[in-house]
Structures are given as C-alpha cells and as structure tokens.
A protein has these predicted regions:
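Acidic/glycine-enriched connector segments
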Residues: 1-150
C-alpha cells in the first residue's frame, strides 16, 4: 500500500491533471492499493482529485481511495453534500486539529497530510506560501517527493 498527498499553489494556469495522473501511475504500477489525501483548497487540489478519479476509472481492479482532508468543519459540506459524497471516498477532519485556532488549522492540516503520506506530489514555482512551506516540511521529514514541472 502507498499513501500520497499533494501540494500546489491555489492558482494553476492551465490544467495539470495529466501530469498528476502520470505521477500517480508510476506509484501504482507495482502496487494494488493507493490511498490519496487531498486538501481541497485550490485549483491544484481540484486537479489532483480529478487525476485520482481518472485513475480509479482506469484501474477498477486496484484499490484507489480519495480522501478529502479538511482543517475544520465547513458549511460547504452541507450545502453541496451530494457533490462531496459522490466525489470522495471519505471526508476527514483530523481529531488533532480540533483544538487549533482556525487561522493555524490549514498549516497544521498540511503537516498532517505529509505526516500520513509516503509521497508528496507537488507543483510549486514560488518560494513562499503554504504550498512551499508544505514542500519544505516534506523534505525535512524525508518524504519521497515527485516535483512536477509547471
């Protein structure tokens, strides 16, 4: 079993779904199980989730799971309940984040994503911001990183 997560800037210019899907295929080619954690906070997360869904259709005999990991409860889960229930296998708000102030919850969630994954698939071109901080954290933790070209 392999677990992976994603990091990228909120704004992505053009689709990168195929690049992400290609990276995921290298992970699953010799494995039967792939668990993917996505943050759901920007365009890169959306493209990442789409790539995982494409892979699920392409490899129906493999166990590929897509989990949305949120930093805190959000109203959009109730407003768009059907979308979330059909788009993700699981929706998780880690218990460790319950006591964290909401302004610090997103960086804490990003660290949780890295801590609970074997791989980080990232597309980062700026040396600041949450995605960059997540990449640096993954590097310090010795995680395997697949850095995609923009």
């Amino acid at each position: 079993m392999i677990t992976c997560t994603f990091a990228g800037h909120r704004e992505v210019f053009g689709s990168c779904t195929q690049k992400i899907e290609n990276a995921l295929e290298t992970l699953i080619e010799n494995e039967d199980t792939l668990y993917c954690y996505v943050g759901g906070m920007g365009e890169f997360d959306g493209f990442s989730a789409a790539a995982v869904r494409n892979l699920k259709r392409k490899y129906p005999n493999k166990e590929i799971r897509l989990t949305l990991v949120l930093p805190y409860m959000q109203q959009k889960l109730n407003e768009y309940k059907e979308y979330y229930e059909t788009s993700f296998d699981d929706i998780l708000i880690p218990a460790e984040l319950a006591e964290i102030h909401y302004k610090r919850a997103i960086p804490a969630r990003n660290r949780w994503l890295v801590d609970n994954s074997d791989y980080l698939i990232a597309m980062i071109w700026r040396d600041y911001g949450g995605a960059y901080t997540t990449l640096r954290y993954a590097q310090k933790q010795g995680k395997k990183i697949i850095l995609l070209e923009r």
